Regions:
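Conserved acidic carboxylate
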Residues: 8
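Active-site beta3 strand of CheY-like receiver
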Residues: 44-50
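Receiver (REC) domain active-site loop signature in two-component systems and cognate sites
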Residues: 55
């Protein structure tokens, strides 16, 4: 299926997301912080990035800004994974350059739907 980079600093969350994605047949690349995410993007060009907003070293906003200004990566689909669920958070995430928004805790149905929409 698709190659997906999961950038999430919380190991149990990252493991859960990896298990869901692998069960759906996706190849998973993992990163534990924003800097690692950018390094992994240089090594592997995935079909999609699942990017936590709150991460050490570089947060998700800094990573998506870097992705959007890098010609080779600019059209890459990036889905925000966030605990932020207040009014206006979704709009802020989309305005920052993300292609989609999913709140945590992540459930398999919502994640699968978002991935299918973004990979069309």
């Amino acid at each position: 299926m698709s190659k997906i980079l999961v950038a999430e600093d919380n190991p149990p969350n990252r493991e859960l997301i990896r298990e869901i994605l692998e069960a759906c047949g996706h190849e998973v690349i993992e990163a534990g912080d924003g800097r690692q995410a950018l390094d992994k993007l240089e090594e592997n060009l995935p079909d999609l990035v699942l990017l936590d907003i709150q991460m050490p070293v570089l947060d998700g906003y800094a990573v998506v800004r870097e992705v959007r200004k890098t010609p080779r990566l600019a059209t890459l689909k990036v889905l925000a994974l966030t605990a932020y669920a207040m009014q206006g958070d979704r709009e802020k995430v989309l305005e920052a350059g993300f292609d989609g928004y999913l709140t945590k805790p992540v459930d398999m149905v919502s994640l699968s739907k978002q991935i299918a929409q973004l990979l069309r």
